[in-house]
Amino acid sequence: MSGHSKWSSIKHKKAATDKKRSKLWSKLARYITMAARDGGGDPAANPRLRLAVDKAKAANMPNNTIEKAIKKGTGDVEGESYEEVLYEGYGPGGVAIMAQAVTDNRARTSPEIKKVFERSGGNLGAQHSVAWMFNTKGVLAISADAVDEDKLMEIALENGAEDVSAADPDYEVICAPEDFARLKAALEAAEIPIQSGDVTMVASNSVTPDLEATRKVIRLMEALDEHDDVTSVSTNCDIPDELMAELSGN
């Protein structure tokens, strides 16, 4: 399992409380609004909006909230003016970290993100300081217990997958962003249960700091993820299996 998937697994385990769910809905609503603004309000014709709506439904966001967010994006309902900002920096152990944000006030958000980095032993970098280490990819996690490997490989590779890697407890399927919707639909049509799926920044190569530095990296990523304006966080830090087991309570 890649560093991205391990971080997604940690985040998923900590997102169950009502308070966190409410914050997640707020972030997803902004993401939906941005997607509708940039590509139109029809999910069938706007892959980015379709992904945003799918994520909102997976988080049990009410349909009327989803519709309102779409209408804000298309201008049918008055709403805040948002922009997307990509923050790049370094965490403990020299790992690269990227945080994607949607904000209605960059002048407020930027210094807040800078403080989060500094309080956790990292530092916010300049534009393009670490982005070159990442590529935008579609990432799908499939439980190894829920699918036959040969079947998964066949369907995935026939529908745009670039790589299928096996790791306990999940398979990780990687594809180009433009193939994500087709690949996800093919897996669903084959009744292969998808643990998680997203289009996100994936590191080209990973680094493995010592355990203490990795713990600090996770705390930094959690702090970034807790920020109201941050929609996703990526790193090139590979989390050791022993630390994953510790964080999972195993």
Regions found by a protein language model. Give the residues of each.
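N-terminal cationic and glycine-rich segments that engage phosphates or anionic surfaces
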Residues: 1-125, 129-139, 202, 248
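Positively charged, low-complexity, intrinsically disordered RNA-binding extensions
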Residues: 139-250
